[in-house]
Design a protein with these regions (language model features):
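Pore-lining transmembrane helices
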Residues: 1-233
Length: 233
């Protein structure tokens, strides 16, 4: 088994899944949803319909972009990598709803977990048959969508519950909870994990979202001041 996993480049480790995959997911999120939101907002403020359309299309591709980025971080072969676009779309769409059908915030988190499993399953069967071009995409997509249908709504509900609890506590005690949220998100910014991905997965908005932004800004100002001697202007 160890020899098979090594040959398939399947490594079960916290670094690969919690750092490499999560960081790649954040990049995929930025290159789709976040940049799309920025462009769309510019279009709305400047009354440029083209930018609004561009932003809408970019935001709509957040699921596939995150899944493909995760597959790239896991060093998935081409057929697995391309198949993850479908998996990401399904996981993001189903993770954005709860079991009751209401809106959920677990799209990015669902994409992360499901894309990892689908990618590793695809890697396991890749180039094992003479009809690899059929088997590998089929396994990757079927496993991914099956897990998306099974897990994603629950992930969406759980992420929404956690995010809502944080936002409720922040509204109840804005000073102390604002400090806690800003410090924790700021610390996440300094670690090899993605603060943007965490906040997106929990759907933080309102005071909690503002506290997270303040924490990140404070950390970046601190980095700039501490490294000014080495980096200059």
């Amino acid at each position: 088994m160890k020899a098979f996993l090594k040959r398939k480049n399947i490594v079960f480790s916290a670094k690969r899944y919690g750092i490499d995959a999560l960081g790649a997911m954040a990049q995929g999120l930025f290159c789709s949803l976040l940049i799309g939101t920025i462009v769309k907002t510019l279009g709305q403020q400047l009354s440029i319909p083209f930018l609004v359309e561009v932003g809408g299309f970019a935001s709509a591709m957040s699921g596939p972009a995150m899944a493909v980025a995760i597959g790239y971080a896991l060093q998935a072969p081409p057929l697995v990598l391309f198949s993850l676009a479908t998996v990401g779309y399904a996981a993001n769409a189903l993770g954005s709803t709860t079991l009751s059908g209401s809106a959920g915030a677990g799209g990015p988190l669902a994409v992360l977990l499901i894309a990892i499993v689908a990618a590793e399953c695809g890697k396991a069967v890749s180039k094992e048959t003479k009809v690899d071009i059929i088997v590998t995409p089929s396994v990757t997509i079927c496993v991914g969508i099956l897990l998306a249908m099974w897990w994603a709504p629950s992930i969406g509900a759980a992420a929404s519950a956690v995010g809502n609890a944080i936002m409720w506590a922040t509204d109840l005690q804005p000073f102390f909870m604002g400090i806690a949220v800003s410090v924790l998100v700021g610390m996440a910014l300094t670690l090899p994990i993605s603060s943007a991905a965490i906040c997106a997965a929990l759907g933080l908005t309102g005071l909690a979202g503002g506290a997270a932004v303040a924490g990140c800004c404070a950390q970046m100002v601190g980095f700039a001041v501490m490294s000014f001697k080495e980096n200059k202007w």
